[in-house]
Amino acid sequence: MSHLQPKRDTPETTSDKVELKSLYLETLQLVERLHRRLLDVIKDEFDRAGRTDINAVQALLLFNIGNSVLTAGELRTRGFYLGSNVSYNLKKLVELGFIDHQRSRVDRRAVRVSLTKAGLQVADIVAVLYDRHIGSIDKVGGLDEGEFQKMNKSLQRLDRFWNDSIMYRL
């Protein structure tokens, strides 16, 4: 009946759990810091260009929308917007002339958004910034295609795990 007794942690498994916890917490900190740093990089790009009419969160949102026509809900579910108040930023971007919005003919509650010419110009600034990074990230940052493939695969698996933990209450 020993197989029914709970498995006790050995020093090796305890050590492994401590190491895994440490690595997991470090990854969480890095993900948070990378998002903040990305916003800092975008803000710096707009500061250099003397653009004070838009903030980094809004510029990133415009880049993520690109040529698409989306609802506010789609912005969140597709991961295009990470903030808590997408409606506020959309309203602000409409007021600033960066976004056009139109009620859906099918569902009057849904508002579909797309970029104006000014919004596309902002999105292009972010695209040019990313292209500049791609031109030097291997040489300067030491990150090549293989590194990005591994990193993306790991982050996708973490995303799937978190999604499953919500859906299946893991």
Question: Can you say where each PLM-predicted feature lies in the sequence?
Answer:
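C-terminal regulatory/oligomerization modules of transcriptional regulators
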Residues: 1-19, 143-170
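Charged, amphipathic alpha-helical coiled-coil/dimerization segments
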Residues: 7, 91-150
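N-terminal positioning helix adjacent to the helix-turn-helix/winged-helix DNA-binding module
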Residues: 23, 56-58, 118, 147
